[in-house]
Regions:
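Ankyrin repeat A-helix N-terminal signature
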Residues: 33-38, 66-72, 100-106, 130-136, ...
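Intrinsically disordered, low-complexity regulatory segments in ankyrin-centric signaling systems
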Residues: 4-5, 20-49, 58-61, 77, ...
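N-terminal signal peptide c-region/cleavage motif recognized by signal peptidases
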Residues: 16-18
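Ankyrin-repeat boundary/"N-cap" motif
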Residues: 24-33, 56-62, 90-96, 121-127, ...
Length: 222
């Protein structure tokens, strides 16, 4: 029985590649393969052959978002250089290229996207949420330098400070507090402050740092 299971699983794996390839035009299949493998010259060839730089894979992600998700910086640069590239195209989950770069803590691409004019703010989840949750103080500062809304709220009312606190990202918490994040806000689901999320996630040292910040400003911790 076990041997039969593994045989069926192996067949499924072998068939998945051709099945996926058949669902996209050949040119787009070549583009996404090149993007995932960071083969910049092959990406250029696909685009020169007329493949849409904003093409989407079977999961609905654009080639640029796929490149960033795979840390394929060379491929991403080729795509961003294309006339008509949509830097603001969203994946089905709402992610943009900048959000993915922040999530991957890919500072060079974050810098490049910002230089090219990628939007920092939007309703709901933002790149700053992802940078804070990932703990990158550098990217958090970069986004704030480009006017990121420091207390941006996710659909459930989560702020970047809450995300950083919940994930135990002390450096990001320090940056956000130093730059004016409101530590008294509560989310709309659990009705917790950033310190409350830190405690809920068993990160008491983060909660202590936030409470000390509030106390220094004469605000009673909640």
């Amino acid at each position: 029985m076990k041997r039969r299971y593994w045989l069926l699983a192996s067949v499924a794996i072998m068939l998945s590649g051709p099945a996926l390839a058949a669902a996209l035009p050949p040119g787009e299949v070549d583009l996404f393969r090149a993007v995932e493998q960071d083969r910049a010259n092959s990406v250029k060839k696909s685009l020169a052959a007329g493949v849409n730089p904003n093409a989407r894979d079977l999961g609905g992600e654009t080639a640029l978002i796929v490149a960033i998700r795979n840390d394929a910086n060379d491929a991403a640069t080729v795509l961003m250089d294309q006339k008509g590239i949509d830097l603001e195209a969203k994946a089905p989950n709402g992610n943009t290229a900048l959000m993915m770069a922040a999530y991957r803590k890919n500072q060079p691409l974050v810098i490049d996207l910002l230089r090219r004019g990628a939007k920092v703010n939007q309703s709901g989840w933002t790149a700053l949420h992802y940078a804070a949750a990932g703990g990158s103080a550098e990217i958090t500062n970069l986004l704030l330098d480009h006017k990121a809304q420091i207390d941006a709220e996710s659909p459930s009312g989560m702020t970047p400070l809450m995300m950083a606190a919940r994930e135990g990202q002390e450096d990001a918490v320090k940056v956000l507090l130093a730059r004016g994040a409101n530590a008294t806000l509560k989310d709309g689901g659990f009705h917790l402050t950033a310190a409350g999320f830190a405690l809920k996630a068993d990160k008491p040292w983060i909660a202590k740092a936030i409470d000390a910040h509030l106390a220094a400003k004469g605000i009673k911790p909640q």
